[in-house]
Amino acid sequence: MSGPVSGPASGQVTPVLSPGEVAAAVDDDDYRRLLGIPRDAGFPDAVAAGAAAARRWYAVHGRPWIAARRHAVAKIDGDAIVLEDGVRVSGERLAARLARNDAHALVAVAVSAGREVADEAARLWGADRPDESYFLDRFATAVVETLLWRASAILCGEAIDSGEWLVPHLSPGCGGWEIDAQRQLFELVGGIDAAPAADLGEPGATVAVLGPVELLDTGSLRPQHSVLAALGVTRRAIVATPEGACRTCDRPGCRYRRVPRARRVEES
């Protein structure tokens, strides 16, 4: 990845990404976790070739994408964040997290592994090559995680240079933040309404567009290997890690948890 992720409050920034660098950055432990293999087990011989082939495919054909936009926070009003331009961002859990950390700004982020990998996984499935399709689908999911944490790390580094720190990210539909906030967050990154989505086969169905990502009326994103997130910006010195986020996450029965949830922990 090259180039900054953050930028002026009024501007969306999309860094230039190298698919080869992104593919190489996907951690083997995370990839195994998404394949349902114990983290420390290594890749069994039966899956090693397929896993490696998926990584090679993405390094050549993948189109990773990130966009981010920063917004100044005017105040936290109960279960909503009020931005300086008057926009209210709904979400009790997000508002509480930003209030606890005295956040003065919010960064809306969108990441995607790209439409190409979703199309290739679908093509392989349709060609009766389900194993190859599965490996590619899981690798694309690992790419999304990698992009989100990489964006967070770069944003954090830039914030620290300005005497600021990032509050751990939260996504609609996870961690107690309602999925209904998906459209609002999409717009905060820079998404705009588009023409009716004729390919959905539903009269009146529409999509909003943000780079290669589309938001459907249902709140779902296309391609499916995409995610939105919001991060608070504070002048309080805090440290958060992916493992720490998993320890505080209240999502029950998550098969992708990196470490066990702590029995007693103060949520950051």
Regions found by a protein language model. Name each.
Residues 55-58, 62, 155, 159, ...:
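Structural signal for hydrophobic packing residues in well-ordered secondary-structure cores
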Residues 60-67, 148-149, 160-165, 255, ...:
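Intrinsically disordered or highly flexible coil/loop and linker segments, enriched in small
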Residues 103-172:
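Conserved mixed alpha/beta catalytic, RNA-binding, or beta-rich assembly cores of soluble enzyme
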